[in-house]
Amino acid sequence: MNTRSLAIAWLACLLVLFEVRGGLASFPQLNLILPRGVQRGGERELVFQGARLKDAEQIFFYSSDPFEVRKLEVVDDNTIKVLLMIPDNVSLGEHLVQIRTRSGISEYRSFMVGALPVVDEKEQNGSLEEAQAIDMNVTVHGTCENEDVDFFAVKATKGQRISVDIEAMRLGSYLFDPYIAILDKDRFELAAVDDSPAALQDGVLSVLAPEDGTYYIQVRETSYGGNGESRYRLNVGHFPRPTAVYPAGGKAGEPTAVQYLGDAAGPLAQDIAVRAEQGMMKLFPSDSNGICPSAITFRSSPFGNALEQEPNQEINAANPVDATLSLNGIIGQPGDVDCFKFAAKKGQVFDVECFARRIRSGLDPVINIYYADGRSIAGNDDSRGPDAYIRFQVPEDAEYVIRVTDHLGRGQVDFVYRIELQPIVPSLTLSIPRIDRYSQTRQTIFVPRGNRFAVLLNASRSNFGGELKLDDSVLPPGMKMVAQNMHASLSQMPVVFEAAADAPIGGKLAKFEASHIDPATGIRGQFQNNADFILGPPNNAVYYNGQVDQLAFAVIEELPFQVEIVQPKAPIVRNGTMQLKVQLKRAEGFKEAVTVEFPFRSPGIGAGSSIQIPAEQNEAVYTLNADGNAAIGTWPIYVIAQGNTPGGPAWASSQLATLEVAEPYTNASLARSACEQGETAQIVCTLAPNKPFE
């Protein structure tokens, strides 16, 4: 990937983006954690940088690993130092954290945990003659300035494995696309890479030393860009660094024999324990020379494995398999095609999911389904991003063939894939819609004492319908939730959280769930969030993100204002308007203007994006309108107010009020008439009552 040509324009856009965000950002704010990674097995100090951190009290860890905060020191409003105890059994790789202060919850950011001791890059090291000598089995913390090239020298004996794994884009802090190479003493490249699918847009390498001697590791930005923010963690050692695992998944809760592929020392066979929880899991292969510093992705699912057997290139040579098993194979050389044959009965429906890029394989899969005689039924390339997906409705009792190959006809020894014929099952996911496309503003629940906070909650139903209810059992002490059940016709609902005046200040991460109104269905789903960590050209494309499955809750200190909706006593009618009165209760001394939003609009209801309650005034009117097809009924409504306080921007919501939408009481029709300019005229209006007035 070449990024230098767009670097100047992108930096300018980035500065504008940060300037815009600054006015909307939630408080407190967490921008960066330094160093970007630490070695497990002891106490480590991390510096959290951001804004409005002076009242920091707690660090939320999204993993279940046994981190222990030994000390939290506030340096100033923009910096805190955290002394962490990181035991030897903490998981390697990325860990997501955020800060709870007495006034709010920050964004979540990442830091890395490694197994190797850390050394710092030392300049000057811009040539082979100046290469920084390092031991094997270390992690180098370095920075690439503009047009900078860093060299590191290591010793190896003939046949020893030299493995290199760089974490740069995966650090999630800056658009730095690294290039790495391994050179011999004569400056010849033994291996080089820009992007490795196993490491996203970072690179991994492993070679066997051809002779005793000194070898050089080169690090630079792929197009010789870089600046002081272009940080990296360079893992160098004798550890295994495969690029794929085969098979790429196993049956949940059962042991599975696998082979790690793509390592210079050859395939590594191991038995692994597949976790009982379904989904993607991380594997860290190890041998007598160490442990792989970053994960190989592996899928835990309800299905056992069927492994391809060559030859299976043609439909008439397809491997016979049971449709209850997952289909595993490798597109091992250019032009390779794999075919599997299975029996199915008319009326069966399968979600045919091909996992390749989602498990970080380099394969860009294309799948097709045929009758066993070769007649085509369906095909797909990219319905799951680069991965393929087909919903297959079996047309008759028969045998069918699934064919898989690479979109460009490529093939490599690590182009693994896994195809699952999944039965149609219901699923449910909750999320909070973004109010700012690239930020985490108001993606957490922070409720001021004696006040309220509200969010819109999205529910993504798949393969089912029906009413949903939320589970409020996970809330912190002193906090309660006010929400109606979500009607089957809706995918979004308002939820108000209230904190008692004496609620203890504190917070937690929790699995926030919803369920079908009928417990017999067993349908449940939980909150998930996906934050953009690195954006870049073109058009603010997302290069790296962070995903979590817990929601952060906190009770925070009191605010100097409260907001209320004056409950409407009459309905809004179709093709009509309503002046919704909003009242502001100010604490003594608080005179700032407050911005009020009306986030939830039932079908057919419109409103402006916001209104202002001017400084030193206590109420305003929000104009609502209903179109001719507005949904009839009684709907929940709320407003949320933002005001500037000495601690930064703050939010409070109103109570959950109701808005009735009704048919007009009368219809009016005007008769055609005419008059001369400057004259008066009478116009006949005919009223037709729709329902009696009360």
Predicted regions, residues:
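Short beta-strand edge segments in extracellular beta-sheet folds
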Residues: S110-V118, R233-F239, R275-E277, T297-N305, ...
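Bacterial N-terminal signal peptides
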Residues: A9-R21
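Beta-sandwich strand segments
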Residues: Y108-S110, G226-R231, G411-V416, A520-N530, ...
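Predominantly extracellular/luminal regions of secreted and cell-surface proteins
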Residues: R109-M136, N289-T324, S427-L430
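Short glycine/proline/serine/threonine-rich loop/turn segments at secondary-structure transition edges
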Residues: N89-L96, G226-E229, Q278-L283, G411-D414, ...
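Surface-exposed, proline-enriched loop/turn segments that connect beta strands in immunoglobulin-like
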Residues: L32-P35, V245-P247, I432, T441-Q443, ...
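Extracellular/luminal low-complexity segments enriched in Ser/Thr/Pro
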Residues: V82-V90, Q259, D271-V274, L456-S460, ...
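Acidic, Ser/Thr/Pro-rich low-complexity intrinsically disordered segments
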Residues: L24-V69, V75-T79, D88, R102, ...
